[in-house]
Amino acid sequence: MATIGKNILENLTTGMYADSKVIYREYVQNACDQIDKAVELGIIDREQAEVFISIKEDERFISVEDNATGVKEADFVAQLGDIANSDKKVGVDKGFRGIGRLCGLAYCKTLVFSTSYKGETKGSKMVFDAKKMREMLSSPVKYTVDDIMGAIVSTETFPEEQEKHYFKVEMIDINHENTDLLDKQLVSDYLSFVAPVPYVNSFHHRDAIYEHAASLHFKIDEYNVEVNGNPLFKKYQNRLYDITNATNKVKKAYDEISSVAFKDFVDSNGQLLAWMWYGVSRFEKAIPKAANPMCGLRVRQGNIQIGDNTTVAKFFKEERGNSYFVGEIFAVSKGLIPNSQRDNFNETVERVEFETQLKKFFYDTLHKLYYMASATRNYGKRNKK
């Protein structure tokens, strides 16, 4: 039988992500999948389902907890101890590879999973010595994955109330080089566009977006996610701003999102690949990101962001074109499968067709929108002279 070397574990933890904040996305994603299952099983109503993130900077402590299904005691060790052996389904669940839960091992001294399943009187806990794992990974000794997991993992059960149902991730003693993970505002700003949360109530065009989604029989998955008790929302604004005073970050509106427009992308068989909305403005100029965190077109699958606000810039005739827009592109086809870093889709026939159509629309429609707006303004300026 083949030996699985320790480098695999390194690739799935310390070598997996360039941005440490991704751990929040991974744990929120897992929580949302379990919320879907809890609602389906009748354990909880969707309105009551929540993901609670707690950040204690002074204690260098982070926890991510949901009130979804939890894990049965009988399934706990196999479900949490196995690597890349998830029973989640591609195209149904937001996460499906069974590797995301390990990401916290790279950023703390101790990682703890604790859970309880409704109807059981015992909770289960799994503790990972993350510091020891990293020491073993950097050692010249050729440890196997089994060697390392056997040395760093311990489990136990504890009494719990029969009606309790939850899953909790705790990251204890966050590494000093990862102090950004303890910045509550930074984390909230990151998750407000990455996580599957609702649009902020003040965004005037959200009803139009929901209506278009409903016309396609598409449900935008939204969940209650809180950071230290503060609910998260997608921070889309009705106006576009400049910063007039960099020191005090004073903002002044220079344009507005007057409406939103839509585009549906279908494959050669007439099946919906994806759809998008984008804000219509006067396209005065490239939107300054410092004053407008929602700038750029963002790709989403399961309402979780793929890549960042620059991911689709390469499909514009000129990359700066992306910075004239705000909007979202929702992947629909099950053939659009996020890669393990969730910064793009796997290479499939559907991805090729999606990108081909995206590029054509950006070239034929979006480029002309902002280019003609600019040409019209320049013409007007010349005539005033």
Regions found by a protein language model. Give the residues of each.
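Charged regulatory segments coupled to nucleotide-binding catalytic modules in large multidomain enzymes
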Residues: K249-K385
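Alpha-helical oligomerization interfaces and scaffolds
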Residues: T14, V51-F52, K56-S63, V169, ...
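Glycine-rich ATP-binding loops of the HATPase_c
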Residues: T110-S114
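Interdomain "switch/hinge" adjacent to the Bergerat
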Residues: M1-T3, A38-K94, G119-P288, M294-C295, ...
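Conserved ATP-binding N-box helix of the HATPase_c
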Residues: Y17-I53, G100-A106
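Glycine-rich phosphate-binding loop
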Residues: V90-C108
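P-loop NTPase nucleotide-binding/switch module
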Residues: M1-L12
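Alpha-helical scaffold elements adjacent to nucleotide-binding pockets in ATP/GTP-utilizing enzyme cores
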Residues: Y24-Y27, D75-D82, C103-Y107, L186-Y190, ...
